[in-house]
Amino acid sequence: DFLLVNLPHQTIEHMEDLLPLMKRETPSLIRGWAIIDRDDLPGVNDKLTNLLLHHGAANLRLICQEIKGFSATKIFIRIESSQTFI
């Protein structure tokens, strides 16, 4: 399974609704982009890790990485996770 989430202002909010659609027992990749407050990057990583694990992600590899500045206080990030949902 491969899921692209291109809703930069709402990616994180919609992620929980999208995870139940992922196929089980097979490797999957989720990639998305988000605009967040600069200081929230560690919290976003923790929130997504917990969300993915709660939905049964095993062998989880998550990257939340700043791509560029969006404004004085916000950044544009790339989110990528690979996992197998069980």
Task: Describe the role of every protein-language-model region.
Residues D1-I86:
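SAM-dependent transferase fold signal centered on methyltransferase-like domains
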